[in-house]
A protein has these predicted regions:
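A short, Lys/Arg-rich alpha-helix, primarily the initiator
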Residues: 1-20
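Short, basic-rich loop-to-helix N-cap that marks the start of a DNA-contacting helix
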Residues: 43-54
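Short, charged recognition helix plus adjacent turn
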Residues: 1, 38, 67-78
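The DNA-recognition helices of helix-turn-helix-type DNA-binding domains
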Residues: 32, 43, 70-74
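Short alpha-helical DNA-recognition segment
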Residues: 20-38
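The alpha-helix within a helix-turn-helix
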Residues: 15, 26, 56
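Residues within the helices of the helix-turn-helix
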Residues: 12, 23, 53
């Protein structure tokens, strides 16, 4: 799996687990809804690290916790 797909799936899984909409994540993270939506829908590449940090803050997790999921075990470079 490509890194961008693993990041995308991880965000989707975390928002589903926490019953958080993209709109709510946008408000909590300070990242625009259009930016989040574009990434989740595969219209843009992986977010920059600082953007991912804000997304993690919006989800209430640490950045290192984000990457501990099994999705990242055999990830390939984009």
């Amino acid at each position: 799996m490509q890194l961008s797909e693993a990041v995308r799936r991880r965000i989707i899984n975390l928002t589903d687990e926490r019953n958080i909409t993209l709109h709510r994540l946008s408000l909590e993270s300070g990242i625009s809804y259009s930016t989040l939506s574009s990434f989740i829908n595969g219209k843009s590449q992986s977010p920059k690290l600082v953007t991912l940090l804000h997304i993690c803050e919006g989800l209430g997790i640490e950045l290192n916790e984000f990457f501990t999921d099994n999705l990242f075990k055999d990830v390939e470079e984009d």
